[in-house]
Design a protein with these regions (language model features):
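Conserved ATP-binding subdomain of kinase catalytic cores across diverse folds
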Residues: 28-144, 148-165, 217-220
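C-lobe/activation-segment region of protein kinase-like
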Residues: 181-232
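Generic beta-strand structural signal
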Residues: 116-119, 170, 181
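Hydrophobic residue at the +6 position relative to the catalytic HRD Asp in the kinase catalytic loop
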Residues: 167-174
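Activation-loop N-terminal segment of eukaryotic-like protein kinases
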Residues: 174-180
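Short, contiguous, pocket-lining structural segments
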Residues: 142, 177, 201
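Short, flexible active-site-adjacent loop segments at beta-strand->alpha-helix junctions, enriched
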Residues: 124-125, 178, 189
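Charged, low-complexity intrinsically disordered tails and linkers
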Residues: 1-49
Length: 232
C-alpha cells in the first residue's frame, strides 16, 4: 500500500499581517505558537486569557501571544480580510478602534478537516464589553455615559466616511475616561469606508442603532442589571 504524506496543519497555515502600532515583531512568529489545528471553542485553558467577552455572532476567545493578549475570532476568509483591511485603515484615523494583527487562513484539524479563518486583533487594555460594565446593578447615569460614548464614536466614524451598518453596544468596547467612558469600535464586519456618507446612510445607522441598542437595554433590564426608572 502506498503512503501519501500530507502537509501538517502548521504547513497549511497562511498568516497575513504586519507589525501595527507600537509592535515591531512580525506577528506570524508569535501566532504560530497558538493551537490553530483545534476549533477555537476547544482551545486549551493554558493559552487563553480569562477576560470578559461580549455577545458575538462568532466564536471569540482571548489568547496569550508573546508578551500580550489578542482577541481571536473565527469567521469566513472573505469577512476576515474585509474587516482586517477596514481596521487597518481606521487605525490611521482619529476614530478609536481595535488594532488588527493578522488574518489566519488554511486552518485544518490534524485529520485535514477544514477550520474557519480567524481574525486576530490586539486586546484593548482596561476595556470592557457593555454587559461587564453592568456586572452589578448600576445607576442610570452610567448608562447615559455609555450612550454618550457610543454617540461620540458614531459621529467620529461617520466623519471618516465609515458606514457601520450594525451599530450596537455589543460591537463596542468601553474604557473609563475622565469620569465618563470612551467607546472603541471592535467589530467592523458590516462596515464600509467611503469618501463621504450620504444622509440616507447616516440615517440608516441611526435607525439600526435605535433598534439594536433598544433591544440590548431591554435585555439588561430583564437580567436585573439595569435599575428601573423611578416614576417622577
Amino acid at each position: 500500500m502506498d503512503t501519501v504524506e500530507t502537509p501538517s496543519p502548521v504547513d497549511r497555515l497562511t498568516i497575513t499581517g504586519a507589525p501595527s502600532g507600537d509592535a515591531t515583531e512580525d506577528p506570524a512568529t508569535s501566532l504560530l505558537a497558538l493551537p490553530w489545528a483545534l476549533p477555537l471553542e476547544t482551545w486549551p485553558r493554558e493559552v487563553l486569557a480569562a477576560l470578559p467577552r461580549g455577545i458575538s455572532r462568532h466564536v471569540v476567545r482571548f489568547a496569550r501571544m508573546g508578551g500580550g493578549i489578542v482577541a481571536v475570532k473565527e469567521t469566513t476568509e472573505e469577512l476576515a480580510f474585509h474587516e482586517y483591511r477596514l481596521l487597518r485603515r481606521l487605525e490611521r484615523s482619529p476614530a478609536p478602534s481595535v488594532v488588527p494583527v493578522a488574518v489566519v487562513t488554511g486552518r485544518t484539524e490534524d485529520d485535514g478537516t477544514p477550520l474557519p479563518a480567524a481574525l486576530v486583533t490586539r486586546h484593548l487594555r482596561f476595556s470592557l464589553p457593555y454587559r461587564a460594565v453592568f456586572s452589578e446593578r448600576l445607576e442610570r447615569r452610567t448608562l447615559v455615559r455609555l450612550m454618550d460614548a457610543l454617540a461620540t464614536l458614531l459621529v467620529e466614524l461617520h466623519l471618516e466616511g465609515f458606514f457601520w451598518g450594525d451599530v450596537s453596544l455589543s460591537n463596542v468596547l468601553f474604557r473609563r475616561d475622565a469620569g465618563g467612558f470612551a467607546a472603541h469600535l471592535v467589530d467592523a464586519e458590516t462596515g464600509e469606508l467611503r469618501q463621504r456618507l450620504s444622509t440616507g446612510q447616516r440615517e440608516h445607522d441611526l435607525d439600526v442603532a435605535a433598534v439594536n441598542v433598544g433591544g440590548e437595554l431591554l435585555d439588561l433590564q430583564a437580567s436585573g442589571l439595569l435599575k428601573p426608572e423611578r416614576p417622577s
